[in-house]
């Protein structure tokens, strides 16, 4: 067997076995209500989002079974607004069994199937390599005017350089902080070249929210140029908000389930694939569906590449198709449920789930592919290797004022990041000294509850972000709506006008910026903000901390006025968070 193929398959086997042995990767979702509408079952589940392919059902004392047609079920849709999961029973006996055991009905999300999909994908492949074939625009013998590279005057020098490299080099990485133009400038212009050349490309992202964020940005830009939305096709299950706004770009197979009366649901997937030039999907959807799509892509674009596990990104290395990675490796790394302390000996293969897509070049420069190869002992923050990768850095951000950009550059980026002249609104609220208990800080929660109603009057785009799951639950007890609270990890891929940050405590892994993992996590929290950042903390404690990112924020921040009486804590407990919502339960 090919040594690379063997390494990839071993990684899948080792990681799957670890999750199975430690009962990880599978979470029970809280069932709040069950309603029968023969032959359909409507189940209200407390979860923000679901992967329909991961769902399993337990009826009575019988072991959980997949919610798929093989076992007599058909998942019609999941409406995240109403939190209703709609299932069709294909067999009356199955429906009777569910009705009989209604009170014992349980729903699980088992994400281990994604590993099985990866394994099946690699089993069918025999060629693995960094792409050598350049994009079509690099062919000097082309006489087509469409195949020339055009950089518009509005691009700055770094953006123009990145665009030229994307369209002429087989493997490239565009690194930039939020607001540097990775998506709305560089990616958009690159895709525009392919659209004008009538050439199909693929846009990928590690999560549904990240995919929809990039597609929304692109659709708005295409709309301004009067380019038909039918040029874009989003495969997989979209959020309700995305479907309502952009139904014409959604997967017709999904539309037929959720919006059967929609004009766009009458089109077949085959015809949509034929007419679309930009196909968007998650990397997991690519793994599962690529073989059945029967299409060829001229270029792969992987957004949020630093959050994408290396082993999933390696699926793109099987086609000798140009690859462009876009992202920011100074933010969150992939979520791996296997501790690195267990990745040794014959378990070292699993490190491919721990490292990010940015280690692709490193992976292919290994002298051998045994479990002792250097790639299997690297950490998420090991130096990146870019000898054959065309690296472009975007140092100018229009998201932040130069006041915040300088802080970010000093503590996190170290690459000369600079921002716009007008400063970012940075505020702090001193909640006085109150020692945190069990990763909860009542003083911070109480202050946030005081200002939250006022903030909501100014903008509905308000998020309260905290590193800790327990603090998020506490915020709910203080009457902060659950859909406005996020953990740092859960907020990845989201954007808000106003971000209120509750640090709770100085914690080595999540708020102590001397630890690079914590610094990158704090960068995520700050970068969710578009206009205003409010830090709620014990001012006297944090201002005394040396070389801390949050301390630097405090030095530049202004006091935020509080006028209302603090609300009292609610007595009821918040809904339990599933593993899908809060990925890292710290």
Language model region names:
Residues 242-257, 405-411, 433-434, 497-503, ...:
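Short, surface-exposed amphipathic charged segments that create phosphate/polyanion-binding patches used
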Residues 259-316, 485-489, 502-524:
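Conserved RecA-like ASCE ATPase "motif II neighborhood" in helicase/translocase motors
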Residues 235-241, 284-288, 466-470, 485-492:
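Conserved helicase motor
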Residues 341-389, 424-425, 510-586:
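Helicase C-terminal subdomain and adjacent C-terminal extension
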Residues 138-245, 273, 278-413, 541, ...:
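ASCE P-loop NTPase helicase motor core
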Residues 1-161, 227, 235-258, 351-355, ...:
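Pre-ATPase regulatory/linker segments immediately N-terminal to the P-loop/RecA-like helicase/translocase core
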Residues 454, 458-463, 472-486, 490-527, ...:
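Conserved helicase C-terminal RecA-like lobe
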Residues 415-478, 484-485:
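Conserved helicase/translocase motor-coupling segment
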């Amino acid at each position: 067997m090919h040594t690379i193929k063997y390494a990839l398959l071993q990684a899948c086997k080792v990681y799957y076995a670890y999750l199975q042995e430690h009962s990880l990767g599978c979470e029970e979702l809280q069932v709040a209500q069950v309603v029968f509408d023969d032959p359909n079952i409507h189940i209200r589940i407390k979860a923000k989002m679901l992967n329909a392919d991961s769902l399993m059902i337990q009826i009575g004392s019988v072991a959980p079974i997949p919610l798929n047609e093989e076992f007599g079920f058909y998942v019609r849709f999941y409406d995240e607004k109403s939190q209703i999961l709609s299932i069709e029973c294909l067999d009356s006996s199955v429906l009777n069994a569910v009705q009989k055991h209604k009170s014992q009905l349980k729903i699980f999300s088992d994400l281990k199937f994604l590993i099985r999909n990866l394994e099946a994908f690699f089993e069918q492949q025999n060629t693995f390599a960094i792409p050598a074939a350049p994009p079509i625009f690099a062919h000097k013998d082309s006489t087509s005017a469409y195949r020339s590279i055009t950089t518009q005057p509005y691009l700055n020098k770094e953006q123009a350089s990145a665009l030229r490299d994307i369209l002429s080099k087989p493997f490239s990485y565009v690194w930039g902080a939020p607001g540097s133009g990775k998506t709305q400038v560089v990616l958009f212009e690159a895709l525009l070249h392919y659209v004008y050349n009538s050439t199909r490309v693929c846009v990928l992202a590690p999560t549904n929210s990240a995919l929809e964020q990039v597609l929304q940005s692109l659709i708005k830009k295409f709309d301004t140029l009067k380019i038909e939305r039918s040029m874009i096709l989003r495969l997989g299950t979209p959020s309700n908000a995305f479907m309502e706004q952009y139904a014409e770009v959604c997967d017709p197979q999904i539309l037929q389930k959720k919006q059967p009366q929609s004009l766009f649901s009458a089109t077949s997937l085959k015809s949509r694939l034929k007419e679309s030039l930009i196909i968007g999907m998650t990397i997991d959807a690519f793994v599962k569906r690529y073989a059945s799509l029967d299409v060829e892509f001229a270029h792969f674009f992987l957004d949020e590449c630093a959050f994408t596990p290396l082993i999933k990104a390696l699926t793109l290395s099987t086609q000798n198709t140009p690859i462009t990675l876009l992202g920011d490796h100074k933010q969150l790394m992939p979520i791996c449920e296997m501790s690195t302390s267990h990745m040794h000996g014959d378990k070292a293969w699993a490190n491919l789930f721990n490292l990010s897509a940015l280690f692709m070049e490193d992976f292919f420069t290994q002298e051998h592919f045994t479990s002792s190869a250097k790639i299997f002992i690297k950490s998420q923050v090991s130096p990146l290797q870019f000898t054959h990768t065309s690296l472009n850095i975007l140092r100018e951000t229009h998201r932040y004022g130069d006041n915040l950009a300088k802080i970010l550059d000093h503590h996190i980026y170290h690459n000369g990041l600079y921002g716009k002249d007008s400063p970012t609104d940075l505020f702090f609220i001193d909640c006085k000294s109150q020692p945190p208990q069990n990763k909860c800080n009542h003083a911070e929660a109480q202050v946030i509850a005081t200002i939250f109603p006022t903030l909501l009057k100014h903008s509905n785009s308000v998020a309260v972000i905290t590193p800790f799951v327990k603090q998020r639950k506490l915020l709910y007890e203080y009457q902060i709506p659950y859909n406005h609270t996020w953990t740092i990890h859960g907020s990845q891929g989201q954007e808000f006008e106003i971000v209120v940050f509750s640090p709770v405590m100085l914690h080595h892994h999540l708020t102590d910026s001397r630890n690079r993992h914590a610094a990158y996590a704090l960068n995520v929290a700050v970068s969710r903000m578009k206009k205003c950042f409010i830090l709620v903390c014990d001012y006297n404690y944090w201002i005394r901390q040396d070389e801390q990112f949050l301390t630097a924020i405090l030095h530049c921040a202004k006091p935020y006025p509080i006028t209302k009486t603090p609300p009292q804590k609610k007595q009821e407990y918040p809904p339990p968070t599933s593993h899908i919502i809060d990925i890292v339960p710290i």
